[in-house]
Design a protein with these regions (language model features):
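12-transmembrane solute porter fold
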Residues: 2-10, 14, 28-199
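Alpha-helical transmembrane segments
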Residues: 16-19
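Membrane-interface capping segments at transmembrane-helix boundaries
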Residues: 21-27
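Transmembrane-helix exit segments and adjacent C-terminal regions of multi-pass membrane proteins
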Residues: 202-204
Length: 204
């Protein structure tokens, strides 16, 4: 659609202008582009971004499915989704002691693998499924996020010069909510495409 295309082009132009202005500010820049020359920092930021896309991007649609399709009350929906939150808290608490015995890179890889496995389990969910089918996916998404996300900020800050630690922390923090927003958008586009293919136009 024309309006979507122009909005995208306008956003891309604004982003390009922002990066150009930041590059001109040098050490006074809000976003130090030089940080992206550090491979480990880039990897930590991208993992933060991807982790939030796949761990949290589905949550709004799961909420809509539980409430709109299965007609669960807000309280019951919240209790079901609490499984992911509690698992994430427990996994995050365990990830600290584990990092003393296992390489952080191994923990990050294991966490992302668990998230991927959880997403794979989502293929078992149908319109007729009940919440027990959803539970393994929520537990795995929570466990994977809990293992990875606590270490990514430390990793991003530890590999940059000390004077740029604040900028590195701010940049990495920016990619957390950005990943969630992009994840919601991506899964929303996917849902819309599936609905347009599966339902007749009058139903839409």
């Amino acid at each position: 659609q024309t309006d979507v295309l122009w909005t995208f082009l306008g956003g891309a132009a604004a982003a390009g202008l922002f990066f150009w202005l930041e590059a001109r500010r040098g050490e006074r820049a809000l976003l130090h582009l030089g940080l992206f020359r550090i491979p480990t920092f880039v990897g930590a930021v991208l993992l933060s971004f991807a982790g939030r896309i796949f761990s949290f991007g589905l949550l709004p649609f799961i909420t809509l499915w539980l409430g709109g399709i299965l007609h669960y009350s807000p309280l019951k929906t919240g209790l079901i989704l609490l499984a992911q939150s509690l698992t994430m808290v427990i996994a995050a608490g365990l990830s600290g002691p584990l990092s003393g015995r296992i390489s952080v890179r191994v923990l990050l890889a294991a966490g992302m693998f668990i998230v991927a496995a959880g997403l794979l389990l989502s293929s078992r969910v149908t319109a007729e499924s009940g919440w027990p089918v959803l539970l393994p996916m929520l537990l795995m998404l929570g466990a994977g996020a809990g293992l990875t996300l606590p270490h990514l900020m430390d990793l991003a800050v530890s590999v940059v010069p000390a004077r740029q630690a604040g900028a590195a922390s701010g940049t990495a923090n920016t990619f957390f909510p950005l990943g969630t927003a992009v994840g919601i958008a991506l899964f929303g586009v996917l849902l819309n495409a599936i609905l347009q293919h599966a339902l007749p136009l009058p139903a839409l």
